[in-house]
């Protein structure tokens, strides 16, 4: 039997990593074999993304172009899908991914790139069974990110974060597999809401 593919999305500070871990633990308690993964990955492409994009590195006197950035993320995702996600699903595992296709669409669309083009270069990426958007006001996102001492270039750009959040909400209307969870609630309450979604949408409970 094919496994389930679940993605957690949201702006910085929305609790994706924490909730992905909690959901993985919950599935394991139910007897499932679980693969917890993330994007960018730990592959060579993921390393390039961290060095050239997330650290805002300069190449030949200028920042990497947004088009090149989008293609790097797509290349990393292609490797991830072919070598990690699909093989795990074929083995019947539950794959839980911290960020996926929707991150690329939301962030790079906010950078001014064409949504149609972004979807085209990511057309190889299989849609998950369930994509959970942890929605959070931008001011709370910035507060949480500052509190953990992890301010990146993305986090500093308040207007960008506003655009990204708006884009995520638009994507939730476009993609039938996306569901929104209020990330302002406590960690425990958010986890309970996610489990309720999984039971209803995937397991028919």
UniProtKB/Swiss-Prot annotation:
E.C. numbers: 2.7.4.9
InterPro entries from the UniProt entry: P-loop_NTPase, Thymidylate_kin-like_dom, Thymidylate_kin_CS, Thymidylate_kinase
GO BP annotation list: dTDP biosynthetic process; dTTP biosynthetic process; dUDP biosynthetic process
PROSITE patterns with a match to the protein in the record: THYMIDYLATE_KINASE
Catalytic activity, reaction form: dTMP + ATP = dTDP + ADP
MF terms (GO), sorted A to Z: ATP binding; dTMP kinase activity
Pfam families reported for this sequence: Thymidylate_kin (PF02223)
Keywords (A to Z) from UniProt: ATP-binding, Kinase, Nucleotide biosynthesis, Nucleotide-binding, Transferase
Gene3D superfamilies, alphabetized: P-loop containing nucleotide triphosphate hydrolases
GO cellular component: cytoplasm
Residues annotated as binding ATP: 10-17
PANTHER family: THYMIDYLATE KINASE, UMP-CMP KINASE 2, MITOCHONDRIAL
Family as reported in the entry's similarity comment: Belongs to the thymidylate kinase family.
Protein name: Probable thymidylate kinase
Annotated organism of origin: Pyrococcus abyssi (strain GE5 / Orsay)
């Amino acid at each position: 039997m094919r496994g389930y593919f679940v993605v957690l999305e949201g702006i910085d500070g929305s609790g994706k990593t924490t909730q992905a871990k909690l959901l993985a633990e919950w599935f394991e308690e139910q007897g499932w074999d679980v693969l917890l993964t993330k994007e960018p990955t730990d592959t060579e492409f993921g390393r390039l993304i961290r060095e050239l994009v997330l650290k805002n590195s300069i190449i030949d006197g200028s920042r990497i172009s947004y088009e090149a950035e989008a293609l790097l993320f797509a290349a990393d995702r292609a490797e991830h899908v072919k070598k990690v996600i699909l093989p795990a699903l074929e083995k019947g595992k539950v794959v839980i991914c911290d960020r996926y296709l929707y991150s690329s669409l939301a962030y790079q669309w906010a950078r001014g790139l064409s949504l149609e083009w972004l979807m085209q270069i990511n057309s190889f990426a299989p849609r998950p069974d369930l994509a959970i958007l942890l929605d959070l006001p931008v001011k709370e996102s910035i507060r949480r990110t500052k509190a953990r001492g992890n301010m990146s270039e993305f986090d500093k750009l308040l207007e960008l974060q506003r655009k990204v959040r708006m884009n995520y909400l638009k994507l939730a209307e476009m993609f039938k597999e996306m569901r929104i969870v209020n990330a302002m609630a406590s960690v425990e309450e958010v986890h309970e809401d996610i489990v309720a979604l999984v039971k209803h949408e995937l397991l028919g409970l």
